[in-house]
Amino acid sequence: MKKNSAFHNTQYSPKVVRRDYSKVHNKYNPLNLPGIQVNAYKQFLEKELEEIIGSYFPIKSPNGKYSVEFHGMKILDPQITKEEASAESKTYDASLYVNLSLVNHQTGTVKKISKKSAKSKAEGIYFADIPLMTENGAFIVNGIEKFVVAQIVRSPGAYILNKSQVKLSNSRKRNQEGYICEVFPSKGTLMLFYIAENKDFVQAVVRDVGGESAKVFSITTLLKAFGLSEIKIKEIFNNNDYILRSLESEFYNEKQILNEADIAQLIRDIESDRISKVKSLPIDQKWKNLVLDWYKLNQEKQELLNSSNPNPTKIESLNTHIGVVLRKLICEKAAKHVIQELSISTRSLDNVSQKEEISYQSILLQHFFQKKRYDLSSAGRHKFVRKLRVSERLYQRTIAQDIKDLDGNVVIKQGTLMLKEQLDLFKRLSKEKRLDIIKQIDFINPELNTQFTDVNTYEEVQIYVNNDLRNETTQIIGIDGSNESIETLTLADLISIVSYIVNLPFNIGLYDDIDHLGNKRLKLINELLKSKVQTGMMRIEKYIKDKLQTADGNNKLADQDAENDPDSDLGTKSSNDLTVKSVINPKPFQIVIKDFFNTHQLTQFLDQQNPLSELTNKRRISAMGPGGISREDPNLDIRDVHYSHYGRICPIETPEGMNIGLIMSLAFYATIDKNGFLMTPYLKVENGKITDKVEHLTALREDEYIIAEASSYMDVAKDGTINNEKIIARYRSSQDLYDPKQVDYIDVSPKQVVSVAASLIPFLENDDSSRALMGANMQRQATPLLKPYSPLVGTGVEYKIAQDSGMLVTAKNPGTVTYVDASKITVKGEDNKSTDYNLLKFVKSNKNTCYNQSPIVAVGDKIETNQALADGPSMKNGELALGQNVLVGFTTWSGYNYEDAVIISDRLFKDDVYSSIHIDEYTIECLRTKNGDEEITRDIPNISESAKRYLDEEGVIMVGAEVKEGDILVGKTSPKGQVELTPEEKLIQAILGDKVKQVRESSLKVPNGGDGIVAGIKRFSIANGDELEDDVLELVKVYVVQKRKIQIGDKVAGRHGNKGIISKIVAQEDMPHLEDGTPLDILLNPLGVPSRMNIGQIFELHLGYAARELAKAKLIEACFDKKLADQLDTVFGLEKSKTQSLIKNLVEHMKSIGVTSLAQTKNRVRTIDIDIVLKQLGLTYDDLAFKIATPVFEGVNMEDLKAIMSEAGIDPDKTEGKFKLIDGRTGEPFEKPISVGIMYMLKLDHMVDDKIHARAVGPYSKITQQPLGGKSQNGGQRFGEMEVWALQAYGAAHNLREILTIKSDDVRGRNMTYNAIVKGLSIPEPGVPESFKLLTKELQGLGMTLNVLYDDDSIENINNISVVDESLEPKIHDAEFDTFTLDDYNDDNF
């Protein structure tokens, strides 16, 4: 046979070898695929939870008498295991204890909660039970596995835009256009700084605290309010025109400030000596003192000026002092103006005890520059630094000054054009703080300079506005990016923002693309839960403050309430009785935790349809959720694929319908950084040579580099040097040819662009994207089969996905298998310690599929770390196995595969090829009611003994019983309501005592379509000490197993979006067959390929057939080649004993037909000969699996396909992959050759057993009296308007009348009809539909009267009677309803 050099064999495990056609051979392995949430939750429990709780303490009483202080917290070990939580429908959680103390500062006493009794498990107060995460990243809540989906949101930061809107809480939006910088904090109010389109000065729009409206300020008013003087503002911005015009547009300057109403009035009060009589708030004292200082200084100056010998030096000194006082006054008044406009509370201060020293400016600084109130978060600071640093605006700009280092040496000369090399140098020196470009901000109040020392520096560089003319300069101000630990807003940030805006009209700076992934980040479970915990802690804080305020004697109303309410906590207690428990109520904390895991939008049932669906659920990200995007939002830009998604978010896998583009999947290698930004790995390229150094880049960092695509690996020397002169690479959104020496990085793998599910589709590159999307989504819907087989044509990631799904049992340590049975594997390690691995047996998943694990190792096997020990559902030898390899032909067959219908052979039905197991859980509760307790019993009234034949003596079904719909699973009786007894019943009760109970049957029965075998019973009872909900005495769960064979109406699909419904099951002998007698398994319509453009399925078909033929060839060759025979168990994934028996039996069979050498086998050993030998050992062709891996974007190409077909004995040029087919019914060959091959087909969750449904009678809607809809409500099929037209077209008047009356909403008519059918009478005439009654009532509701006009012209008023009254019924059939106009009515009618 011809050796194909385009492949290599890859061994994934001792039983899995694939012929690998990948072209890129780097050894980069992805991290644990579902791992991102696991690490986030671990960080939350170990670090963040304590930080959040601790940040709210100490809590002090208003007068400082008491304080509640925090001394740490402890999470105890869980009381039950994960397995027990699942089995007993409990939550897998651990108790949180918080150690608090109550300090009385007057007496010095400290009260704590100590661990006094065995009942209290730890020191401190019990706060809540915190659910714990399993190793697989899920939570077990009430016995159900749940998962928290990561949310993708806009990152906090500064954004440069030309259009923006401020959303207000009353559903209004304020739109703004121009040169805009949007400051988007993690916590705090949104701010816009902008130059409007028709204005020439800078303004700021700030949303007020309530979010009701947005206020506009001149930028200089804000800067003054924050503590900058007009002189300093002009100095910082170098007398920029926009800033000068902003100063002119506002009121707060030395000329106009004294004319301000409050100040003018105060001056008049001082002059008239009324100052002492004017009462003022402590917060107003600061500016009033400043006015007083100004008045005194001004008086002194006037006296000097009026004196006969004025001292110029002293006057100059006084002028300086007056200037300082005025500037301080301007700042304070500007701050007051901002605070009042934004409705900022002046009470909610941290420093409450020092009210006399409080000023409006200090409140404003506290509101905007304090993390508790205005938080940028680490992600926001990271974005601020990247956007507002000077280097961001220097690219391709000419420097208008010498840039020197701290020693005075010129690093970059004036006139230098800043290109990548110079910019890299500038960035490096700037980060190291080695450039002499750093300036300091000076506040008017000197104490602020010391308070904000670390954060009031900025960088400044002069550049030319025009690179060519160089006649005008402008300055660029940027933040000092060396300290990224500051998570609050700073004055330097605001100055840098203003600088950015005023330079935008000169095209200095870049606008932001809001859909770029660098501007979005992931909120993982730690952040989502953090916001909920903060809500709970705020409520607890408020409760503690209220209690302490009452105890402090500060709240008279509270004291009165306590006196009036003798049951209140503190009303009956003296302050000496105050304890930690009496001032704290952890209930709000418990509620938010419970709500998060039960009702939060992003907390979902874990999709356990199969291992792939579970894994993709854990890698899903959603743009919806609290503060996210609504699914009704029509914005296509949000949903569209963006170039920055490359390697981070899959461009293929997303739902169809309303959620398209809002729910996404992480790409195969995607990870996240500490700030929540998505990263993807690249290999570093240095001087045209690919190194082994892997770096993970965020979308923003990637924008700085030139990155080559993975196809560049095709021509690489042994040392990693790229041999091509030019290679395809991308820079931001554009692709071009680059010299390898210009390239910075290269992709680690061609599949890094797609998700886990999309990477399972072979020949993905040959499929249309919309079909690939369907293929990726439908693999998640595949039902786990009884006998799964991994695909012959795979992509090489099947083993990795199975391993990371959490359903594959893998060895923790190396060793030897010492014990194996269906439920347990024991491995003895190298240290002679044994480890037991318990296997799941027939467990119901969230999607009612069967999760079962079966061992794939034998006693004596040597085991390596992470080697597969037992397969989970949809797995074979540790590989993902969602479907079956079946022989498919593309041909029509009597029209049965028209419009995507599928014809299958009954072999798939008889041999259980597509059979699956489903487990349904039925639950019944035994309740305590006001009429008495319900009872689970076998003694059920009005039920025959035959109906109770499978119930045990307690009334519960026996395990193993085969049940049909309507059968009783659990017998239960409920007490009837209290009714008056008849004399006869009273007599019987008097004779028999109280034995005759008034009970009714309320048993649990098998619903429609619920036939199966009872597999298990779980009983929970208060009597046995189980925890149940209030008023529940006993809970019984019954598990019924169904084995579902494939049938007409089931949905099947390939991996390329080629889906269809089974329309006919044909006998195997009637199916078309190949010339060697092999019958086809499935017939697909050839018209399903061209328009869908999913040609990948055709490639898979031919490659799969070549693999099947190669398996036969390898088996025959192994009969004459001892070396190959020894390897065959690994090639086929069979047990060694079975492989040896197979070869031995085949050799004997060949001898019986006279074949003794390999040369003789070519024409004499037929398919049927191999089939006979396989059947002797209980095997099928599916067990002869010669597996191939063709990874996405780098797998089998046309040359490889032709080579492997030739190797398998198929002439690709002569046959084109098409074969002569013979009709099984007639024995006649088809007219032309037909494409036949092996395709991997899945049985999907959409099974006809779940959908098929019939109704004779059933429930009706209360209002319309029409039948309900849907299977769950035993509803009918809606006969709509168009269906009515169809009957009208055929003139089927009687059918139509039936459908619109007795089969719909003619209440009396349907009852009479039912009665007639039961008694065998003829069907009566229909009456008036309820919808007509509804119409009359709605018209009467509009104030209109309705009259009935009879044939004899008599009129009857029907406004006070029902139109379906029996006495009217006969007349109405022959009546006409009069039309009316308003003119017909007189006043008496109203």
From Swiss-Prot:
The gene is rpoB. GO terms for cellular component: DNA-directed RNA polymerase complex. This is DNA-directed RNA polymerase subunit beta. Disulfide bonds: none annotated. DNA-dependent RNA polymerase catalyzes the transcription of DNA into RNA using the four ribonucleoside triphosphates as substrates. It comes from Mycoplasmoides gallisepticum (strain R(low / passage 15 / clone 2)) (Mycoplasma gallisepticum). Its EC number is 2.7.7.6. It catalyses: RNA(n) + a ribonucleoside 5'-triphosphate = RNA(n+1) + diphosphate. Belongs to the RNA polymerase beta chain family. It is an enzyme of class 2 (transferase). The keyword Nucleus does not apply. Keywords: DNA-directed RNA polymerase, Nucleotidyltransferase, Transcription, Transferase. It holds the Pfam family RNA_pol_Rpb2_6. Residues 556-576 are annotated as: Disordered.
